[in-house]
Curated annotation (Swiss-Prot):
Keyword Secreted tagged: yes
Main location, first listed in the record: secreted
Family as reported in the entry's similarity comment: Belongs to the bradykinin-potentiating peptide family.
Domain of life, per lineage: Eukaryota
Entry keyword Cell cycle: no
Keywords: Hypotensive agent, Metalloenzyme inhibitor, Metalloprotease inhibitor, Protease inhibitor, Secreted
GO BP: regulation of blood pressure
Physiological role: This peptide both inhibits the activity of the angiotensin-converting enzyme (ACE) and enhances the action of bradykinin by inhibiting the peptidases that inactivate it. It acts as an indirect hypotensive agent.
Organism: Bothrops neuwiedi (Neuwied's lancehead)
Name of this chain's protein: Bradykinin-potentiating peptide 2
GO CC entries: extracellular region
Localization: Secreted
One example GO MF annotation: peptidase inhibitor activity
Tissue expression pattern: Expressed by the venom gland.
Length: 10
């Protein structure tokens, strides 16, 4: 489920 934490920086 998305919308919890933002994706990690790459």
């Amino acid at each position: 489920e998305e919308g919890g934490r933002p994706p990690p920086p790459i």
